[in-house]
Design a protein with these regions (language model features):
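Positively charged n-region of N-terminal signal peptides that target proteins for export
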Residues: 1-4
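Bacterial N-terminal signal peptides
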Residues: 9-20
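Boundary at the C-terminal end of the N-terminal hydrophobic targeting segment
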Residues: 21-27
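Thiol-based oxidoreductase modules, predominantly thioredoxin-like and allied folds used
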Residues: 35-39, 79-98
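A short beta-strand-turn-helix
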Residues: 37-53
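Short active-site neighborhood of thiol/selenol oxidoreductases, capturing the structured segment around
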Residues: 51-64
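Typically the conserved alpha-helix immediately C-terminal to a functionally engaged Cys/Sec
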Residues: 67-82
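Non-catalytic, surface beta->alpha helical segment in thiol-disulfide oxidoreductase systems
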Residues: 108-157
Length: 157
């Protein structure tokens, strides 16, 4: 009897572990911190001025499924390579409300990606090809953000 109870408990907790591993996590996504040199805001601004590099600024949250999906495009080898031409800054909107308000020409939706000059000035002409939510790049494929990065490099360098 005791053996059956132990086996049943082992099976129950084993299943809980399997279900836990199979459940998707929306804890902000994996933004490729190994391949991309993400910087905090103040340090990133200083680095951009010093190295005369444009800035790619991304706002996200930990609870946003679109942000989790968008984080995956930053694993693309072409995006990783292109990121080296920028100072990459990633900010959690919920933890940086004042900055999120400052960078919200068409709203505080997420994720939002902006391209700034090395001096930290937003160029409003550099945005995704859409009328609404202009700073929302396609979350499902890297082509959209790559096109944005290429345009930013041409205009801001």
């Amino acid at each position: 009897m005791r053996t059956r109870a132990l086996i049943a408990a082992g099976c129950f907790f084993g299943l809980l572990g399997i279900v836990g591993l199979a459940t998707p996590s929306f804890a902000g996504g994996d933004w490729n911190d190994v391949g991309i040199a993400w910087q905090p805001y103040d340090k990133g601004l200083a680095e951009a001025k010093e190295k005369k590099k444009p800035i790619c600024l991304v706002f996200y949250t930990d609870w946003c499924p679109h942000c989790t999906n968008y984080s995956k495009v930053f694993h693309d080898p072409k995006v990783v390579e292109q990121s080296k031409s920028f100072v990459m800054i990633r900010l959690n909107k919920d933890e940086n409300k004042e900055l999120s308000s400052q960078y919200a020409p068409d709203g505080q939706y997420i994720p939002r990606t902006y391209f700034l000059s090395s001096g930290g000035t937003l160029d409003p002409s550099l945005h995704a090809p859409r009328d609404k939510y202009q700073y929302f790049y396609d979350e499902s494929a890297p082509a959209s953000i790559l096109a944005g990065m290429e345009s930013a490099l041409k205009k801001l360098n």
